[in-house]
Structures are given as C-alpha cells and as structure tokens.
C-alpha cells in the first residue's frame, strides 16, 4: 500500500522502486473519481509562479521544480504573500523527477544521495490549512544519516480588499514563537503556524530572513518512513488549534479531504451534464473547462456571499468578482448553482455598475471604473437565469428600491431616450473596453457595444412579457438600432463593422469581439458573410487558437495577448464558437474550437488569455485560473449540442457534431425541470427523455414540451 505522496505505476510500487507499507497512511487510498482532473507534470507548461492548488478556503503556491517547497498562502481575508516553506536534505533541495496536479494536491518525487523522496502537498477540505507529507526511503544497502532542514519564513495580514492583484503582505512583519515541533509567525492581524512530527527538531535562527528547523533522520537500508508538516493560517488561536488537529491523525485528515474533494468532483458531474466524444480531446476540453466553476468557488464565512464565485483564485490572483467575467458564463451558472446565481445578480444590482466593474467580496462594495458591456452582461445573467430555471418570480424581487425587472429595463435603456428616435451611443474616450496599447484607438461609437444593445432590448422585452408586463416600448427599439448599425458603421469594402471616432470618421479595428454579435439577430446575412470572410489563417486564426485582433491590423501586438493580438481572452474562443453555432455556422465554429483543444492537455487550469500562434499563455497577470474559462464547456452544451430554453418553457435540441469528432453524447441534462440525454452522430441523433426516445436527422430540431 502506498501513501498519497507517491505516484503509483503498479500496486505496491513507485517509479523509484518498490514501496513498503506505511501504517500512518494505509487508509488514504484515493477513489477513482478523485483523479478526474489529474494532470501529469511532464505535460504541464504552467510556470511555478502561477502554479498552485485550492480548496475553497485556501490557495497555496507549489514550487514543482523541487519536492518540498511551498510559496504563498492566501486564505481570504488572511494571507501571507511571501510565505515560504522549504525542505532540504543534505543541505540542498531535492530536484523533482516527476509530479502531478489535482485541485487540492500536488505530488512530487525525487532522489538525492540514495534517498528516494516522495511528497504530497494537500489542502485539507473545509479548513484554512494543509499537510505536506514527506516519505523518505533509503534506496541503498547502507545505513544513512539524513540531515533535514525546514526553512520557514513569511509575513502576515488580514486583507480588507481583494480585487485584481494578489495581496502583498510584505510590509506586515511577524513575531516568531518557537515551541516543540511548532513555529508561530504572528502579529495583530493573526498568524500562520507550521508544525511537524519530525523528531528532535532544533530551531536555528541566523537572521530574521533566514531561519530553519534542523534534525537528522537515521535510516536503515531499505527503510521507508513518512513524516508530516502541517501549515495553517487565520486568527492565532484558531490556527494553532487547527495545526494540532491536522497532526493528531494526519492520515485520517488526508483521507477525509480526498473523499470530500471526490464528492466535489462528483457534484460537478451531477449538476452539469457529462459529455463524451469520439475525439477524446474534446471530452477532456469540456471537463477541464467545467472545473473552473469549482476552482473559483469559495466558501468563506467572511465574504458577503457564501458560496462566492471569484474571477480568479489560484495564489490569490483576481479574487474580486468582475461582472464581465462572471457574466461570460450566464447559461452555466443557473444549472450549476442557481441559488448563488440569484445572489450574485442581486449583489451586482446593489453596486452601481455604471461606475464600477467589480465588487470586493469582503464588504460587497463596487470598485474600479465601469466596463461598457456591463448593461448587456447583467441583462444576460438575469435572462438566462429565468429561462434556465423557470423562476419568473425572481423578476419581482426588490433590490435597492427597484424590482429585478425594473433594473433590467433601467440597464437596457441606459444612455437612451425612448421618447426620441433611436441613436447609436457615443461612449467617448473610454479606453477600458479593449485596453489597447500604443497609439491605436477603439472608442466613441462602438459597433459591438451598440450591437449588444439590440440583444439587451430583445431580452428585456421577453422578460417583461414573461412577467406579464406590456413590453411595447422595448419591442419597438431593436430594429431601428439594427438599421442604424449597418447604415452608420458597416463598411462594405472592408466587410467589417467600424467605429466612428470623435472626428466623425469611420475607422476599422479588426477585433474578434465583433464575432460575439453572431446569433443575436443584429446582423443581416451580408454582414455575417462579410465578417466570416475574415475568419482565416491570414487574419484571425493560427494553429493554436484565435487571435484577438487580425494579424493584418496595424494595432496587432504579439505581446498583448488578451485583446491586442497575440492570442485571445480565454472565454472568447468558446463564446464566439457558441455564437456561430447559434447563428447557423457550425463549420466556422468548430474550426475555431478545435484549435484550442490543446489547452486541456497542457494547462491544469486556464488563465486570463492563451496564445494563438504558440503553445503558451499570458504570464504578465495574476489571473491564472479564470472562472470564465468555463465558456468552453458552455459552448459544448449550448453550441455543439444545441440546447436552447425557450420563453415558452419548451426546450429545443439541435446538435452539431463536429467533423473532427463525429460521435458525441451529453447525458444528465437538467434544465428548467427537463431531464434528458442527447446522443448524436453526423447523420442523426436521439433525445432520451425518461422512457421516451425522440429521434431526428441532424439539422432538424427536437422540441421537448414544457414541464408542468
């Protein structure tokens, strides 16, 4: 039997040689579902600076190049940004030969001077703490005295604001208290505590920056033993008490955490459909994309919402909740966590989204300037929540003196005057929309934002009708906007929608954000075909993805990955592919999507932006685990599998199996009270609803009757 810190190739063996029983951890046998999201380190391109694990209360950085270093602990509201725990044998770090990743655990293996070392760093579920299990095996035929050092350092703070950057606690020094097998770093904000069961630990303090425990482990030939190091943070008494609990029976704690993590994986699969494809890359892409809902879910008592879904998570990056990002998966959230979807919508309505783009989870206050898409985003969240749950009464709930429906109408008409003829809104010099670098602009009368107003009016009118209100004033607005958009901003020669600058001139900026207008109804056929003519390898496509700006645009900047050229904001390939599926262009959709399947093979989680012409990702950002990376899975359900909830309560199914993966299935769909499976190939498909099976040819939709 093997310990959690061992990578197993065959029962009872490790890649470094035969294993021996470890009585301290015999219970800790990981269930199969625990490995659902596992990834081998040899495939991972994520750099150490961005590499970590999370348990919903705590996220920790793992230095995978050696077997025993941790860097940075973030357990909102507490943090130690420069926390460092470093294991050395014979005075040096043990180089990692093999490692793997799971959401709450990293396992590493190495060998030094005949001592095989395997470690497991695991965050304990439901706690602001974790365990580093260290297994040593003397692989020689001689007795060995193994010098062990544990370096421990760091500052600490109770952080009141969690926005875009990682918190920086380095100005908040700590007082160090050393006890038997325990070290406490504390100040007025709280503490982090490290405890270990290594025998005869002696604290050697060289300076405030260089201190470590030392001991010597005497090992007989072939002997194998496991020791544990627990780490916790929070209020001092709580952190000390938790450390004691973790070391009292570490194997039991590890087993319970593995089981709890397994249940979280199973919960993800139970609440959202299970997708399988003949091309296993597509199946893996779907599952890896879905996990971002789980990885960005916090259960922090101090947060204004619990559970709370952050924009980012790993290593404390971008823990604030941005409306842009949260609302990029509006169709998924009501299926996965409908109660949280309601609460997040209401929290955004409490914040003035005409002035702010995020709210701080500690106090719920808005921060930052506005984003121009905020109105379209919040309406989309409300629209899909009502459609996918059937909870029409939500529109009657009051938030800050207005009903949810009144907020929908308020946001849809923002910047407009319904008593006057329709106009395209001039958004001024706002540069936050695409955040382009250098001298290149994209401002004033913008095609994508004005085009998005069309969809907002359509959705607002439908919601009003569902609530029994007369939506005449809303219904009358979309068509004039559509006409104005084409008349004012369409360039038939460039086959593109331009923006009108402050000089009144039409300028072209070939941004992929325009493609998000597909499927909304605001584009006519001439515009759709014109825009699609640019989806080629000279302009927007490369071998490994979609570019945010055409490679022929003078504003193209290789290093500006998210919106400036070199790649794309992580949600956009999935979002755009879904829009194209909905608009009736499946070939173009799959041509984009298939280029991004490598993400699931090389990145354990997906950050802000991914490069399109290399296997690489954006590194100059703390947002390395983005919630809206789940847009890929959203595309699979609502694009490839063609699931659509109608305002009538009916569910339409119209799948589009891709050429590169002709056989697909989506099982366990649960939307608006309807439960069904979809099994399809390139010719025909069937929808199984209870004991009934509905069959059809691909291209001919099946309609499931509204639930009672």
What is the meaning of each model-derived region?
Residues 5-7, 15-80, 285, 318-321, ...:
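C-terminal capping/lid segments that line or modulate ligand- or cofactor-binding pockets
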Residues 130-132, 227-229, 264, 285, ...:
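Alpha-helical packing segments of well-folded alpha/beta enzyme cores
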Residues 276-319, 343-365, 410-445, 483-568, ...:
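Extended glycan-interaction surfaces of carbohydrate-active proteins
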Residues 317-427, 447-450, 454, 570-576, ...:
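Aromatic-rich carbohydrate-recognition surfaces in CAZymes
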Residues 137-144, 338, 418-420, 462-473, ...:
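Secondary-structure boundary elements
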Residues 274-283, 333-346, 386-409, 461-479, ...:
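Structural helix-adjacent loops and short alpha-helical linkers that scaffold large soluble proteins
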Residues 446-471, 475-478, 482-485, 567-603:
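Extended amphipathic alpha-helical segments enriched in small hydrophobics
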Residues 2-281, 582-585, 643-708:
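Terminal accessory carbohydrate-recognition/targeting modules of carbohydrate-active enzymes
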